[in-house]
Amino acid sequence: MALLSLSSCYNGNSNGNATSANPSFDEVITSRRSVRKYDASKKISEAEVRDLIKAVQDAPSWANQQPTKYYVAISPEKLAAVQDMVGGNKERIKDAPVLIVSTYERGKSGFFQGEQSNEVGDGWGAYDNGLSNCYLVLKARAMGFDTLIMGMRDADKLRELFSIPENETVMAVISLGYRAEEPNRPERKNLDEIVKFF
């Protein structure tokens, strides 16, 4: 995986979140939310983002291809530019101190010696990207941060802004920051609606 770092910022670790210093995995899962309002007074350092992405490198991928790449907006100029590329989410993430563009390199996962391994093809790249992003949002929560994965984004403008190669698919923009309020927990489906035992 690659980390594109654009600038450094505040190094503080104080977050005021409800998570403990060493939350259990269950605590991380149950406290993670898609956060749509961030605390503008709290910043995240480049070093903290690097620690986050380093942990994400342990995510599984097809034949260890590691197709996911990250482009990190952390400078005021790049943050403002990306905010204009996320459609209706602009107002929701205007106070997030970090915005991360997630991509995957096509022709890696789902391929062997350049040939598509099964009918899913490059869908495996998207699958592996989702696994990496799952690691990202869970590790972020373990670090006391909050996230929002946004599928609404202008891929062409993001590609130009970050000089993203043409062989990478722009999947999502992920905001990273501290929640300004406690979000509600959406209702989940009944377990029997999503699993069958045989």
Describe each region flagged by the PLM.
Residues L4-F198:
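Acidic, surface-exposed loops and disordered segments
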